[in-house]
Every structure is written in structure tokens, then in C-alpha cells.
């Protein structure tokens, strides 16, 4: 009964409700010149909103780099944590401005790495608009509240995208004479991040986190049920592949 209710909810919430609306429209528009467009739109939305498609697409990015064991990480001087957006002005435990879900997972991973390796942490992330708080400042406040000493934290608060993350972190990399750093970001984002950091001449060890997929794809009813999460994950993956193309073509 519980499974049946969850499946019902999935079809009554977006995007499922939109697909049902298209089916109803198709019933009224059969044998008209617009019939094939409804079929095409339905198929496109459906395929982009089911887990069996989204998991395969985003997993192709997440599997690009393995997460290394801490015991094999050697000869590194710092770690770089890339921001992933923030909720500007949102009330937080000890201030205002809150990290997004992905940014919080990245910080949680970096915090555990810091406790294991005692490395300086470069927090990279600025603000898109002048009246917003920089991501690095919000991350700094979070890590200080978690007990990380100020001497371990380096803020890079000018970057607005991944290309600028790499550009401005390079200045810190050179200023502190780093030779190798750990790069912490979401697994789906890691291929593009590594490409941009390597283009700037930095030696990085990828440490992916914030995985969006299970280790093994589960083929059950939910894998073929429309979900807004799957639409979002597909958009993330497509954005990353377009970004990789832009890097390769020199557009970014």
C-alpha cells in the first residue's frame, strides 16, 4: 500500500501531472496534425524525468574519478573546496546566509578530511550580485563554528563560476607555493573542475563527494516513475557536458 501511494503521488505532482495532462490532450487531438507533437513532447518529458535515464547520465560523470582513500593521499599542502551556491540572507545558527545542500555536503567532506590530514582549506566562492554575501564567507563561518581554527582557513571570495574558481585559486596556489592540492567538489562537477584547474597549471587530487546516484541502479517501478529530482539531475548532467565542451573548445 505504501509503495502504491508513493507511485500515485509521483503522478499527481509535477512532472507527472503534466504528463497526465498531455495524455488527456492526446486523447482529444488524435488524428489531427498536432498529434505527433504531443507524442514527442510526452516522450521527451517522460524520458528526462525518470531515474533509469537520469541516473545513467549523471553517473557517467560521477564515475569519472574515484574517491581516493585518505591513506594514499600524500605530499599535498592544502585542499580546495568549491562553493555550490547559497541562500542569501537566510537565517542560520550563528548569522545570516546558508549554504545550499550540495555546498553543505562538500563542506562536511572537507571537514572530515581536515580532521584526518590537518591541511589548510581554501574556500572558493564569491557572489553573483554585489548585494549578496560571498559563498566563501558563509562557508568560513560554518567551519569556524565546527571548530576549525582560523589559521587553517583561506577565503577566495571573488569567483562567480568554476572557471573563476580556478583562476583566483591559482593566485593563492602560487602565493603559498603549493605543489599539490586536494580538490573537493560534487562528483558530477569534478570532470569540469579538474579540467579547468589543470588548464591553470595546478596539480590536483580529485576528491569527489555529494553523489546523486546509488552505487547500483535499481530497476523497479520507481526507476520508471516521473520525478522532479530526475529532471533536475538530468539538467545538472547536461550542463556539465555542455561545460566540458566549452572548456575543450576554449569558450570558457
Regions found by a protein language model. Give the residues of each.
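Hydrophobic alpha-helical segments of integral membrane proteins
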Residues: 3-8, 53, 57-61, 238-245
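Extracytoplasmic/luminal low-complexity segments enriched in Pro/Gly and acidic/polar residues
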Residues: 218-222, 230-252
Amino acid at each position: 500500500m505504501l509503495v502504491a501511494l508513493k507511485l500515485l503521488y509521483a503522478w499527481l505532482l509535477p512532472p507527472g501531472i503534466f504528463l497526465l495532462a498531455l495524455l488527456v490532450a492526446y486523447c482529444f487531438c488524435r488524428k489531427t496534425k498536432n498529434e505527433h507533437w504531443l507524442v514527442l513532447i510526452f516522450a521527451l518529458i517522460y524520458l528526462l524525468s525518470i531515474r533509469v535515464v537520469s541516473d545513467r547520465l549523471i553517473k557517467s560523470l560521477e564515475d569519472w574519478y574515484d574517491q581516493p582513500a585518505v591513506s594514499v593521499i600524500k605530499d599535498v599542502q592544502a585542499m580546495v573546496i568549491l562553493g555550490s551556491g547559497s541562500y542569501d540572507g537566510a537565517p542560520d545558527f550563528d548569522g545570516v546566509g546558508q549554504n545550499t545542500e550540495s555546498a553543505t555536503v562538500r563542506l562536511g567532506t572537507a571537514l572530515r578530511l581536515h580532521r584526518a590530514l590537518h591541511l589548510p582549506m581554501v574556500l572558493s566562492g564569491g557572489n553573483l550580485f554585489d548585494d549578496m554575501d560571498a559563498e566563501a564567507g558563509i562557508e568560513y563561518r560554518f567551519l569556524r563554528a565546527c571548530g576549525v581554527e582560523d589559521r587553517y582557513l583561506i577565503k577566495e571570495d571573488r569567483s562567480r563560476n568554476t572557471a573563476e574558481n580556478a583562476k583566483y585559486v591559482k593566485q593563492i596556489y602560487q602565493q603559498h607555493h603549493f605543489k599539490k592540492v586536494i580538490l573537493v567538489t560534487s562528483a558530477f562537477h569534478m570532470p569540469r573542475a579538474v579540467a579547468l584547474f589543470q588548464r591553470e597549471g595546478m596539480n590536483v587530487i580529485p576528491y569527489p563527494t555529494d553523489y546523486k546516484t546509488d552505487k547500483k541502479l535499481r530497476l523497479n517501478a520507481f526507476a520508471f516513475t516521473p520525478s522532479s529530482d530526475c529532471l533536475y539531475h538530468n539538467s545538472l548532467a547536461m550542463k556539465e557536458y555542455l561545460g566540458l565542451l566549452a572548456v575543450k573548445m576554449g569558450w570558457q
